[in-house]
Amino acid sequence: MRDFLAANPDRIDDAVWECLRRFPLVSSSREVRHDMEWEGVHLKAGDMVMAPTAASALDPAIGGEPMTIDIDRKRPQHSVFGKGTHTCPGAYIARIELRTMLREWLARIPDFRLASGTTIEHASGIVGTVKPFDLVWDA
């Protein structure tokens, strides 16, 4: 994908959208307003529940294999930045920053690769992250 995006920077938006779908950065949490039972689970007023956005991104209904990065996939309406009144006000700037960073990185360091023996590990939770990894490139 690195070579493809370096040669086709007009597809970077699609790559950013798809990577955010597959590896969301945050999960949404909500406070329970009143005691209730849901799916056999007793919830008390004041409890916090978390809705992992990664789960909705893996719904097979999005088309194709949801675990696979596919920048040609029709853009599903994922909830990585929330929905409706709960949409993150920084969603647009975040996508612009990701697009700009990737475009500039690929223009300046197009031949980077993972260092030998390095793997990329994604860690999810309330905030998603990528564990540190090493890159190398030719000067």
PLM region descriptions:
Residues M1-A139:
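Cytochrome P450
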